[in-house]
Every structure is written in structure tokens, then in C-alpha cells.
């Protein structure tokens, strides 16, 4: 017995393109690739396809067409006594021919729904390749996972940029309950983050409002601030604990950081001390590291001036 509801969709003449299997698959792949319920697209008019399985692999959902018996295979071989005998090479097997099992076209458990501890580096890289069709490995990524005061999950990737040939523009895909909404919605995602690639899923995001309303929504502003803070924290943490890696990535991430400092005051306040500059020895230094020797020289000069002044006063006292 079939379980569930059958919905028959009647299409107007100007919408008949959606009756085409490939067009329907295209739409489903775009908007429902990560929908939490499995989706199967089956063309009922196509010729049926079959596959064979072992009896123990059969499930209640399988439609068995026939049972296939394969007789045991034997060969004539010589035994230890040099006598020829018939030896069984492979035993008699039983297989089931069934209608080919449909494969879901979506992944109901995308990487961003999992805890970061459950994800390996290869998982992140594979997800990046599959979603963005970019086969250059990302430099690093940030896994967003927040439950309070709002529900937000996602992954932001820092792509490797070849500025001579590549566009610096990225892609941030916005989802609501794992259903795709749109790319690069600037009312929700800070403009400078558009240089990155990633996915953000926020079930609490209001969808039935205009873009102007989104822009003035305090809740949306909090989402934007949270994402900005997490990105800054990741970069600062890397600079403090993995300075060599931070320096190695600098040519790729500096356009993003500098643009972010121009566009977002809070991001700028956090990142000011972590922007790198090269000195004449081709060594990377932060602004505080550059100013530190200057401050020491200033303090030394001030101390020397004080000492000279004290010596001058002593000499004056001697001649009085």
C-alpha cells in the first residue's frame, strides 16, 4: 500500500518546460539539493531499469522481477596422486533481479548540519568542490554553529585567489531550513564577506518581507554582526597561534581583510593590529610590531634628554 499524499500538478502552456525531466531535475538541484527529506525523481514513462542483489540484501521496498540461479562452476584438476578429478571452483548462487532502486537527488544531511568535531578536512574540501565546482582547494574555512539567541549554521571558505586571472567575487548561498533562497543577499550578509564562498542556513530569517525591511530589521543586523565577529575571531586566532600559516595566506586574504576594514567599522577595530606589512628585509610585521622599536627609541631619547638636563643642572650648581 502506498503511504502519503499524491499531488497532481497541472501546468499552463507557458510552463510546460517543467514537465521535462531534465528541467525539473535542474530546479530541484538548485533549490532542494539539501532538503531534509529525501527526494526521488522518477520518470514513469521511461523504460524500466533493473539490477541484481543477493537475497539477504532485499528490503520491503524492492520489487522482485525474478530469481536467478547460477549453477556451481567446476573444473577438472589433478590431485596429489596425479589423478584427474572434478573440483568445485565457485558454489551455486542465488540472486534476485529487481527494479533498479531509485537514488535520492538530494543530501538530507549536509555538512553544515553536523558538529565540527564530526567533520574531517577531506569532508570540508569535498563539500566545497561539490557545491562551488571549484577544484582548487580552499585555504581554510570557518564552521558556524549557533543556537542562541538565533539559530544559524553554515560554513565559510577562504578561496585561493589568483588575482591575475580570477575574479575576486565569491558566492555566499543563503538557505532556510536547508532550502536554497538566493545567492549574495547583501541585506543579510555583510558586503565584504561576498569575497568568500560559503553557505549560511538560518531558519529564523523572515522570508515574507521586502529587502528594504530586511535592511532595517534588528534581528538581521545581529546575524550580520555575529558572522563578522566569527570571521574576525578566526583570523585573529590564526595570526596569534599560527603566524607562519597566516603569513603564507596573506596574499590571498589581504584583499578581503582590507576591504572589510574599509566597509565595516567593528571588523576594522578588531583587525587593525593584525594587518601585515613587509619591511625592507621582506619580513611580515603587524603595526604594533613596527611601532614597538619606534616607541623604544622614543623612550630612550626621552631618557637621554632627561639625563642631559640633570647633568646641565649639576654643572650650573657647581659654578654658583
Where do the language-model regions lie?
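Conserved GHKL (Bergerat-fold) ATPase module
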Residues: 1-320
